[in-house]
Amino acid sequence: MATKLLSLTCIRKERFSERYPLVRKHLTRSRDGGGGSSSETAAFEIDDPISRAVFQVLGMTCSACAGSVEKAIKRLPGIHDAVIDALNNRAQILFYPNSVDVETIRETIEDAGFEASLIENEANERSRQVCRIRINGMTCTSCSSTIERVLQSVNGVQRAHVALAIEEAEIHYDPRLSSYDRLLEEIENAGFEAVLISTGEDVSKIDLKIDGELTDESMKVIERSLEALPGVQSVEISHGTDKISVLYKPDVTGPRNFIQVIESTVFGHSGHIKATIFSEGGVGRESQKQGEIKQYYKSFLWSLVFTVPVFLTAMVFMYIPGIKDLLMFKVINMLTVGEIIRCVLATPVQFVIGWRFYTGSYKALRRGSANMDVLIALGTNAAYFYSLYTVLRAATSPDFKGVDFFETSAMLISFIILGKYLEVMAKGKTSQAIAKLMNLAPDTAILLSLDKEGNVTGEEEIDGRLIQKNDVIKIVPGAKVASDGYVIWGQSHVNESMITGEARPVAKRKGDTVIGGTLNENGVLHVKVTRVGSESALAQIVRLVESAQLAKAPVQKLADRISKFFVPLVIFLSFSTWLAWFLAGKLHWYPESWIPSSMDSFELALQFGISVMVIACPCALGLATPTAVMVGTGVGASQGVLIKGGQALERAHKVNCIVFDKTGTLTMGKPVVVKTKLLKNMVLREFYELVAATEVNSEHPLAKAIVEYAKKFRDDEENPAWPEACDFVSITGKGVKATVKGREIMVGNKNLMNDHKVIIPDDAEELLADSEDMAQTGILVSINSELIGVLSVSDPLKPSAREAISILKSMNIKSIMVTGDNWGTANSIAREVGIDSVIAEAKPEQKAEKVKELQAAGHVVAMVGDGINDSPALVAADVGMAIGAGTDIAIEAADIVLMKSNLEDVITAIDLSRKTFSRIRLNYVWALGYNLMGIPIAAGVLFPGTRFRLPPWIAGAAMAASSVSVVCCSLLLKNYKRPKKLDHLEIREIQVERV
């Protein structure tokens, strides 16, 4: 029996860690000693969750082979059970990973004479954690690539993504081999600042600030009190700031409990202690970004204080009589007042304001890579130290004539810092979508106190961050819903547009779910909290969008490849430019008239070399894709379209074929009454009262649809009191019958009526035939053996489904419907919606096979579905789109989630991906074009014919402007509007008739 159970579970791919969560078992093994004459039994205890591994075993031909493999495996210590399937060449092993590993099991199978390869290892899946780290100090793709290489070299790291645009890293790692502390250390050793955002563990962390007169002993008492609470993992106290960090399981406890424990603690004369949630201000991404903006702004202002006088003394005052004479006054030998002023003012710009470029260069070069900081440091150093050389020579030589370039280095640094300031500001705007989502949660909430009967006994306004699971909160009109939950009292309309994009307010009544961050418009609601913190819908949306922005689009690989050799190539070109012009001048390959009066050939060559070095911009290439993806995914989230990263965006813009599931995708997903035909003169309200009283006792979906529709004719619509039904009988496959108000009521199909000799008139037969042609279910109603009415029940098409398919055709996208329903219903729905290609009676694996067939035919396929049976096809498709109202499994398998559950968003998703990708292309054209044109111009390619040259400070300004322009180009996506065709879609109305 156990073997059959294991085999069945292998087929169903259940997780054995759930079936056997923790087993404490004593295993015995024999150990031969002294020639085998004696043996001792060693018992060892294993306190370890069972893991499952599945191997493909080749070479087994019969049950004897399977038996030999099973025996060999079961001899190993730590094996709980083994099931060998010779027919399918599979071996499924349940084992304790602390006692035996999968490699030992594989070697044992091969020692038995068979070839084994691991297919699935649940231990690896369970042991993987994902942590997110914010990284400060990255300037270009070279920095992000360096950090990725560093992280991927750490033992236990399985995958690492570093996003330059949002300055974050997502690391998948095995906590048994590494830790997030080690990851932070490696990033900091690489020369960058690292701040942990989340650990990936199923715990939450909160920081509390304690106010009051505290001693070390009292802090220890608080620490012990908190550690004694169920669900608290660890408590860490920072004595300098009186801050307490608590790591806890949100399912068990919460921050309000911590504050109550702390504030209930009294230490003699110290009195009560006040605890509040600690706010560090600069921890969040937005706060950190604002701090970075302020830092660049201050640096730029200080650079102006020194650079403007340098510029004036070098470029302006030299042409003003009187001032020129003062500046040209010789102090020592050939050293002038102007040179001294420029040297003194340029030095703090070079070594104080420009210090960030030195540190950035050092960190990059220490790791064997080069970035933008290296180019800036080399270029400004060349200008500054050559200028310093001219000052020293002028001070020590009575006949030296030279020109300093202090204005070049100072202006170069000032313009680059200005560019960085504008770039950081623009990059900050690319993440505004996330900031807006995070700000949706209200600051406070009204907590209700209830007695045992559920009556409200009091209310209290609390910090919104103190809400815990199973709390009951009050939502007043005009207030935001404080947390996810369901309504236990009241009714209202809630504006969910900020989460789902749905423009119209959604009616809410008892039992309906509400989403934290949405706006209650009218009416008071009492909501029981079901999800808080990282589990909330808002937090999950934010996390999904953040993960999407971390994921690189395949086109980003182009920039990554270029960045590896870009800076070394630019340094080589810069040196070659200087050398070529220097040799040309020394060898008199160009006339001396080409040399400006204030320079010599060496200085002219140096200017060209520096210009090449500082005009090149790898940052523009690095920002081309991630900034567009950031804005695109943010805009999508605001439209109710959650796109899981750049890869999904890139694939979606190529889609030319969409496969639709029927139920819940093209249709509403639940039956409703769409038509009522009364054959006798009867009041509709009375008719439905009798029918509902009969059907309310049935659990059939069609019965529930009829009862739900009947409520519309009642004044007490929310909780109607139906007449009592006596002698209720449910006849499987036919219908129900009961006695209501002394009348015999039958509701069912033709077979039910025929069995009870109820005459079905011709017009009723026609109605049934019409219903069948329209993929509807015809239901007959008789009263006292006389047919009174015909109901048509169907799963109606979603509003605008037909128009959505038509718009897709206009976009040259082919639509196909695949469903598990019968061919009659499938063809009827397809005709109604306008789909030509239909596949019916398809199993889940057949849906996936159809997707693969379309891909083999050259189509780029998107699959749109909502159910568990759609998951294989969603995974197989180039782009999987899950209807937001569908199951969690379908949503997990998809690349794009449609929050509003309507088909219009399929069009929006594809259109947005096309617009985003065209923006990425435009960014690359600009970034590559800028470098391909700018570098030759800076090198002096136009100088021989036009005498036009690019001074280094202008080249630096152009470099800074190129990055800003790429970011601004991406920001234009924020103005995205969905296709105008979607604004004119007609809504299908449900028809109700009566005679």
UniProtKB/Swiss-Prot annotation:
TM annotation in the entry: 300-321, 341-360, 368-388, 407-427, 562-584, 606-623, 921-940, 953-971
Compartments it resides in: Membrane
GO molecular function, one term: copper ion binding
Superkingdom to which the source organism belongs: Eukaryota
PROSITE patterns, per the entry: ATPASE_E1_E2, HMA_1, HMA_2
Residues on Extracellular side: 322-340, 389-406, 585-605, 941-952
EC number: 7.2.2.8
Keywords: ATP-binding, Copper, Copper transport, Ion transport, Magnesium, Membrane, Metal-binding, Nucleotide-binding, Repeat, Translocase, Transmembrane, Transmembrane helix, Transport
GO BP field: detoxification of copper ion; response to copper ion
Residues engaged in binding Mg(2+): D866, D870
Annotated tissue distribution: Expressed in roots and flowers.
Cytoplasmic side: 1-299, 361-367, 428-561, 624-920, 972-995
UniProt: Cu(+) 1 binding residues: C62, C65
Deleted gene: phenotype: No visible phenotype under normal growth conditions, but mutant plants are hypersensitive to copper excess.
Active site per database record: D661
Subunit architecture: Interacts with ATX1.
Name assigned to this protein: Probable copper-transporting ATPase HMA5
Lineage: Eukaryota, Viridiplantae, Streptophyta, Embryophyta, Tracheophyta
